[in-house]
């Protein structure tokens, strides 16, 4: 039983490592594409995103 518990722990750790190594693909998108995304969001969602990111706020101001 300890053996299976140990293998579960190993799998959990490897998943965490994989999550940490994932690339943020949204940041790679050009501003014109991000502008098309942000105008389709509900206003409350757009406001939350703009509060978190200067780039998104700039894109919102341009649209």
Swiss-Prot record:
Database matches in Gene3D superfamilies: 1.20.1280.50
InterPro entries attached to this UniProt entry: F-box-like_dom_sf, F-box_dom
Chain ranges of the F-box domain: 23-63
The protein's name in its UniProt record: Putative F-box protein At1g47702
Organism: Arabidopsis thaliana
């Amino acid at each position: 039983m300890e053996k299976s518990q140990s293998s579960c722990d190993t799998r959990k750790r490897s998943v965490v490592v994989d999550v940490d190594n994932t690339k943020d693909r949204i940041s790679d998108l050009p501003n014109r594409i991000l502008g098309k995304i942000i105008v389709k969001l509900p206003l409350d969602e757009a406001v939350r995103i703009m509060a978190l990111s200067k780039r998104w706020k700039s894109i919102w101001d341009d649209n």
